[in-house]
Amino acid sequence: MKKLIFKLSVGITPLALIGLGSFGLAVSGAKPNNLKPVNQVGEMNSQGQSNLLEKARRWRNSNFTSLSIDGTNPGALVLTGSKSISRIDLYGNVIWTFDPGNTNDLTGKVGFYDANNKLTAFSGDVSFNVSDLSSKTVVEATQDQEDPNVFYLLLMPDAAVQQEQKTKDQVFENYFMSDAPAAGDTSAEGSATPAGGGSGSSAAGGGAVAPAAASSTARLVEEGNSAGMGTMTPTASTSETVIDYNSDQNKIPKPKTLLDSSESSESINGGRTYANINTQKNLQGVIVKVNENLFNSENPFAVENMAFIKPKDMVDNYPSTWTQGSANGKMTNVLQFYKHDNPNAVNNRFYRAKYYPKRLETQTTTPLIDSSFSPYEHPEWYEGNQFVMPWMQYITNLGGLYAKDGMVYLFGGNGTWVNNESALSIGVFRTKFENRTAEAPGNTKTVGYPYGILLSAISFDATRNGLALAAPALGQDVGYHFVPRLAVGGVSSPRGANGNIFLGSAITWGTNGGNFLDTKWHSPAVIEDAPTTFITVNSSGVLQNSGSQQSTSTPMPNSNGNESIPYRWTNSYDYNSVRFAALISKPAGGNTKQVESLFTTALKLDTLNSLPNKFTQENNIFFSYAMLDGRQWSLGTRKDSTWLTTNTINNFTYNTQQQLASTAAGENANPRNILNALTTAKGFDRRDIGNVDILYSNNTNKFTYYYQVGGAITTWPEVQVNYKTSANITYYNLTRTDFGSTTPATQDANTVSSKLNGAYLSSTGDQQGWYNGSIYVKKASFTPSSQGYTWQDFKGLTTTASNAVISNWTKAGYSIRPDDDTVFSVSKIPFEKEITAAVNVRSLDSYYVQLNGETSVNTVARVSPDSSALTLNPKRITNPLMNRDNVIGQGAFISRNDIPSSFFENKINDIVTTEADGTEVLDSKYINSIYRYTPPQNNPHIRLRLLVIDRSRATNDFIKLLPQVLVDGEYVAVPQANSVFVSDQEFTGFDALPGYVLPVAISIPIIIIALALALGLGIGIPMSQNRKMLKQGFAISNKKVDILTTAVGSVFKQIINRTSVTNIKKTPQMLQANKKDGASSPSKPSAPAAKKPTGPTKPSAPGAKPTAPAKPKAPAPTKKIE
């Protein structure tokens, strides 16, 4: 029986195990498949392992300290150390650092991530070597707008970074030798020392190239203005010959000697020639493509590709007129000079120069070198009489980084890395990074596009703009004689801007005949007199006659050497004023050296991506579509030309376009005056244009752009197609007492100058005034900043999640809230200790500043949840993880084995809801089933949601969720507990059957089979055994019966055989005798058998053995087993 039980157990146990295994598979099939959770890497065992940010730094040329990062794990990229850039999360935890000086570490990071997030080296040849980065410094970064895991880093040659110069108040005494003789004075020409600086002239003992010209004035005549003006037409260029620029006849005012010769372009270029830059990688900027993968804790970033930028990439696309040699052999368009010394200056009227140049009119085919954009007047752009891209200009143009889908752009910098007004950006570099393969990183291609061709579509709609004065000198002709150069504050293109790139900058203008002045209406006072009045002066410039009429507009030399000079100027041809269509302006005879006005526009990214690599005259029409709309550009006010002078430069108190449009605005409404009022009047350089930032306006439902201009925050509306040019542009002047100021001073007719922004010496010497090349500021006095602020102290614009914009300076922040402001107020945030950097993190309603001498950061945040005022938290962040938990709490997804199977019995569509803003989130009733969250102590009721960042819609395959909490109106991702990484998690296995269905469906057939087998084994086997035993028993019994029968038969047979026939008769008697003894008849046969000796004894055995058949009953006990 025990053997039978053992056999049954052995038979049933495998079946039971199969059933249990099936049940386990069914249950586990309802659990989530957690694919690639971010929180699985980079976790920290304790909060004490937080990595603090190193010392942050700023690169002024591109206004860069940090980049706010969007995506699954938001935060920032921050310039740190002396050469590096660090990636931090929202709370200051350092995730990784890119150090170009550590090439050994970078070498191991060259490659790509495979499907398993493993860093894999390229199997083929790699065209770059990270060892070339050892001579570079990271100065800027951007995030690819299409792939948030891809960053592009801009690295600059160490040689350029080491040249960064400390800024100073932009006043004359800080830049020029005030006691130098007047270089334009005939008496001083022989002994004058050539100067550098703003003009970039030859240093003492240098070559023969003359210093750049200052600005003699020129009269620009409106076409068909009056009878007097109409008779004044330039002499045909074919009959006139230009004079040598360095001859005694050339009386163009020369710049004064620089106070610091290191600020001259020659010193800055330092022998780094254009040819050397193109061939030596250590002198080139480079863009590095970095791929971030936070699933890989060992290698959180990979160096995927690199592209070196060469100045040749830009020069190769200069228009043909820019690269042609001189046609007249003298590289100038000056024909002659009229010497004049007017003794009858009128007090408070306009500036008049001593020498009046007459210039040859520029034609569309004139080589640029023969206009006033020549090696003499713009030496900073020439090398060996060739218009190229020297070192100073090349480094300046490396800035303004932007990237989308592998197309990377450099829109340029503002040039403030050096104290040279001519350091400006001339165009846009475009680098295409091709897709990588497993074998190679992909090819790169860099081309450059000058702004002269990208902005060639500038035009205006006269019916819409209604210009009161003359259009600005921004128009382009088919010969491309206007050479715009920009001080670029920055660019921005949020995802919602449809690929339109907003450009915030200041821009140079073109001029008439090479002179820096280009107004048609306001010029020296003498020109406002009768248009045909002439004066006569002798060769010394002394007035001989006045008021006499001349029969011709051409000055006539007298026999005594005297010369008649018209009050109206001889340069009567038009200038490059903006026209109603592209490329139909008059050629610009010259180009200003400095930026003249603010300038914003929008460029179309799709067009920039598709532009031909090579610009030619034949395909120039394609480039005219680079602008979103040629009519959509702004100078910060109405599109008029400038007044020649102003006495109200520091009285700029206007905030809006509507205020500037009023008659009370006067000179303040002029675009040139606005730029000067915001910069030079406060001691800033006109190139002091800050970084561009953006906010989404809840009032207008549009983006608003911001950038710093000297001592003011300016706001600009989003530029769109058919956008109204009257859109509001706001100027937020920062606290006036903290910045420098210019005030008018007592003046007389002979001292009508200001030394505030005068880079050039008047031809009449110090007593007659200084002229800066574009706008003349009357006699004034300058008061430096009470805080000692220069552009060096500007640390950048930052924004907060609650739409605050903060201008950060070393000693204070200045905050505005445009969506809430109706009175245009600025709130000051005092910093108890000077700051060295401001770090922008767009996702929080706060930002970070780094105090001087500290390696940690402090928070600038709201005073309280009920207040919009910001304040600096005096406590340094020493534990970023604790700081994070105090703000948003912490959480973690529940282990897969602990999630109830009922969660996966739902369809994805049944557990997802849509919020008012259109985002999909997990239904709140399911959150506790899969996520455990601990809120911050001071905000226990903070709102938590699980954002759907990816899911299958057609099927119920998967859903990916990201935990977020609502902080100050913005949802912020919640990192995994004790980790620097945000955790998004993927779940699969939805629309599963109830937990009991599958186990039951599998178990019931198995149980039935098992029962059947058990019954078959438990009943069938014993029955079979009993039957067999019965058969054996019957066989034995039958055998014994047969034996007995045979024995009995044998006995009877013997008896019969022994009885003879003779005894037959006796037999009845014997039978009868037996019948008489019927009662004892059964026993009687034994008696005779016993008495007989032999024969009768054998039959007796069968007679006793008939009981033997009962023995087969012995197997009967087996029935008890049943």
Swiss-Prot record:
Record GO cellular component, one term: plasma membrane
**Positions with biased composition (Gly residues):** 195-208
InterPro entries referenced in this protein's UniProt entry, alphabetically: Adhesin_P1 (IPR022400), P1_N (IPR022116)
Q: Name one GO biological process term.
A: adhesion of symbiont to microvasculature
List membrane-spanning regions. 997-1021
Q: What is its main location?
A: membrane
Q: Where is the composition biased (Low complexity)?
A: 1079-1122
Q: Which residues form the signal peptide?
A: 1-30
> What are the start and end residues of every segment in region (Disordered)?
183-209, 244-273, 544-563, 1066-1122
Where is there biased composition of kind Polar residues?
259-273
Keywords of the record: Cell membrane, Cytadherence, Membrane, Signal, Transmembrane, Transmembrane helix
Say what the protein does.
Answer: Could be involved in cytadherence.
Would you tell me the protein name for this molecule?
Adhesin P1
Q: Which organism is it from?
A: Mycoplasmoides gallisepticum
Encoded by which gene? gapA
